[in-house]
């Protein structure tokens, strides 16, 4: 699917802004304000300092047990940082798509799970994230664009192309993993955790969830017609794809997981599972997270990991209260050294085993 370079030059492209004004009838001042608001939602995300990271969410903590190679691959005009985790004798490979506000390293526990169970893994940082190029993350369709290019890179790579491919994504990575099924027919299985259905309509749906139905503007005076036009210019035909269309376009096994108390991607509003009645295929397995697994991120982890995460946050908060100030880097690092990183990031074994079983049954 074709891409464009609007992510690089739209800020200074008066012709594009003029086209939006002509098409929408909006005043230039309104367009500039709306654009600034939109762009503020999608900044660049840098990797946090390791002393602020709890859990095995940094490669330095697992490198003795998990081999990987790094490389760059193109996504339109951008170079994305890719990571390959080999597994001896593996004939299958899982492509892992990270969530927003995160990067590839934040899914190392899941990468390790697949590698230790016989799969090679390909992961990458999305545009505007961690080690990849890009001044911003651009929009909600970005992970789909990046995954499309990642799969094209794999298809044309002499060594990577020999693997049977599987997809695993979380949140906006789950949206990408399911939506891309419309474009790539060599995928053998797909698992999406807490995915939303459409990157194109998500902002509108979030606005409707909190402010009710509206005709002309989003919350904060965000013009709806600007939003539609701007995203169409940024992402072109990618805006026409969504998870339901992707799932309905294939008969490969698909695993959809979502927590009932997900306050990021609402179980009842934006989620793929809320569109269950639109899915015609019988190839979908649903996993509903409840209790400790009901949240957007807690669905990923074991019950004891979730309990330990709460304990660590409580202890950190208490330490800050005792100091009556923000901790210094040295104090934060000292606290971090006493955290059981393995326990903190332990995966939801029930869910991951179900995904693994589904993948293992695929040809």
Enumerate the predicted regions with their spans:
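C-terminal catalytic histidine-bearing segment of alpha/beta-hydrolase fold enzymes
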Residues: 281-363
């Amino acid at each position: 699917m074709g891409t464009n370079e609007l992510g690089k030059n739209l800020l200074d492209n008066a012709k594009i802004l003029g086209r939006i004004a002509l098409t929408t009838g909006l005043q230039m001042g309104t367009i500039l304000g709306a654009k600034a608001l939109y762009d503020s939602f999608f900044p660049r995300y840098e990797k946090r300092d390791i002393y602020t990271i709890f859990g095995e969410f940094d490669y330095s903590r697992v490198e003795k047990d998990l081999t990987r190679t790094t490389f760059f691959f193109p996504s339109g005009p951008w170079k994305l940082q890719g990571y390959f985790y080999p597994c001896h004798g593996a004939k299958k490979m899982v492509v892992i798509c990270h969530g927003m506000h995160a990067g590839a390293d934040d899914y190392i526990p899941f990468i390790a799970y697949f590698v230790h169970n016989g799969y090679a893994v390909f992961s990458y940082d999305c545009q505007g994230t961690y080690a990849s190029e890009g001044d911003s993350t651009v929009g909600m369709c970005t992970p789909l664009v990046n995954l499309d290019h990642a799969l094209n890179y794999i298809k044309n790579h002499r060594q990577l192309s020999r693997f049977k491919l599987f997809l695993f994504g979380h949140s906006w990575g789950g949206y990408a993993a399911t939506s891309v099924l419309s474009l790539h027919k060599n995928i053998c299985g797909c698992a999406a955790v807490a995915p939303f259905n459409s990157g194109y309509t998500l902002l509108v749906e979030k606005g409707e969830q909190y402010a009710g139905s509206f005709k002309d503007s989003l919350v904060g005076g965000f013009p709806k017609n600007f939003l539609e036009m701007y995203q169409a210019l940024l992402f072109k035909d990618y805006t026409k794809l969504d998870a339901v269309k992707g799932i309905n376009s294939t008969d490969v096994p698909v695993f959809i997981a979502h927590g009932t108390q997900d306050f990021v991607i609402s179980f009842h509003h934006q989620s793929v599972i809320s569109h269950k009645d639109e899915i015609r295929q019988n190839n979908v397995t649903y996993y509903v997270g409840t209790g400790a697994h009901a949240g957007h991120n807690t669905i990923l982890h074991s019950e004891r990991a979730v309990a330990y995460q709460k304990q660590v946050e409580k202890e950190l908060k208490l330490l800050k209260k005792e100091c009556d100030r923000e901790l210094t880097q040295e104090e934060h690092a000292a606290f971090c050294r006493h955290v059981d990183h393995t326990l903190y990031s332990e995966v939801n074994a029930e869910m991951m085993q179900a995904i693994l079983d589904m993948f293992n049954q695929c040809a």
